[in-house]
């Protein structure tokens, strides 16, 4: 049985999980966020978004000062009390955004793959794609260790593109709406394990972990959690885990923040 009184970390995806996929509303999750905050349970945001976007959202959600995982694990924003850790305030894994952009531009020029990156357009275009304000859309372009893109070619070409990236030490990852290119060594799972170990080192005891996500790129995160909530999502691929023991994995009937609330209700209130 889970209790918010025990040493606990909650890791959560954003779009389609804690935030509504279309309106970005999070109010259905607000009561649980308040309850966790009052119990001093860290809610660690974990997303494909940039750290600039996530810091803005973190403050909006009342979670400022906590660590977060940005760009699918390629960037870790450290907790404000971790100032003695090398790299503070952020740890960046592997190849930089600029280097990845150079690789993609070369592949597009020489092998004629068809895609559009966030670097190819302005904030007004991204605002149209996402429904964000222009000021928020501008934050989506502040990548440090990944590139976000829209794929505009065939499935066959995608397989070729993925293979070429793998040869170059990169990975091609599907998110809720867009595709992401990042260092092959980076991942939400590695970033989460690093944060868990840091909390364990501080307290002397490994905290119990609960993760929530809705897309294929959340699977690595949910695999390393003690308990997992798979929020009903829009992605046709869904989320599939190696261990879907119903005592540790709950699939919600509701989407977005209502599903987020349902998952917390299942593992806490209903047990």
From Swiss-Prot:
Main location: cytoplasm
Enzyme Commission (EC) number: 3.1.3.70
Catalytic activity annotation: 2-O-(alpha-D-mannosyl)-3-phosphoglycerate + H2O = (2R)-2-O-(alpha-D-mannosyl)-glycerate + phosphate
A GO cellular component entry from the record: cytosol
Superkingdom assignment: Bacteria
Family matches, as Pfam families: Hydrolase_3
A single GO BP: mannosylglycerate biosynthetic process
Active site: 13
UniProt cross-references to Gene3D superfamilies, sorted A to Z: HAD superfamily/HAD-like, Putative mannosyl-3-phosphoglycerate phosphatase, domain 2
Coiled-coil zones: none
SUPFAM superfamilies in UniProt: HAD-like
GO MF annotation terms: magnesium ion binding; mannosyl-3-phosphoglycerate phosphatase activity
Family stated for the protein in its record: Belongs to the HAD-like hydrolase superfamily. MPGP family.
Protein name (record): Mannosyl-3-phosphoglycerate phosphatase
């Amino acid at each position: 049985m889970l209790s918010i009184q025990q040493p606990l970390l909650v890791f959560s995806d954003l779009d389609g999980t804690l935030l509504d996929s279309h309106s970005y509303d999070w109010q259905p999750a607000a009561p649980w966020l308040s309850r966790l905050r009052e119990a001093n349970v860290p809610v660690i945001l974990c997303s494909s978004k940039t750290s600039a976007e996530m810091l803005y959202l973190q403050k909006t959600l009342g979670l400022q000062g906590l660590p977060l995982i940005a760009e699918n694990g390629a960037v870790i924003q450290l907790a404000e009390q971790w100032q003695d850790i090398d790299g503070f305030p952020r740890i960046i894994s592997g190849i930089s955004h600029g280097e990845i952009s150079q690789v993609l531009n070369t592949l597009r020029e020489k092998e004629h793959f068809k895609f559009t990156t966030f670097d190819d357009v302005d904030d007004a275009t991204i605002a149209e794609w996402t429904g964000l304000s222009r000021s928020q859309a501008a934050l989506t372009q502040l990548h440090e260790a990944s590139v976000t893109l829209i794929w505009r070619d065939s499935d066959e070409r995608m397989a070729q593109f993925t293979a070429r990236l793998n040869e170059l030490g990169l990975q091609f990852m599907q998110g809720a709406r867009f595709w992401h290119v990042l260092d092959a060594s980076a991942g939400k799972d590695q970033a989460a394990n690093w944060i868990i170990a840091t909390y364990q080192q501080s307290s002397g005891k490994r905290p119990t972990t609960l993760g929530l996500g809705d897309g294929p790129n959340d699977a690595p995160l949910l695999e390393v959690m003690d308990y997992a909530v798979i929020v009903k999502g829009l992605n046709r691929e869904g989320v599939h885990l190696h261990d879907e023991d119903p005592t540790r994995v709950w699939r919600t009937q509701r989407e977005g923040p209502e599903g987020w609330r349902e998952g917390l209700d299942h593992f806490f209130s209903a047990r």
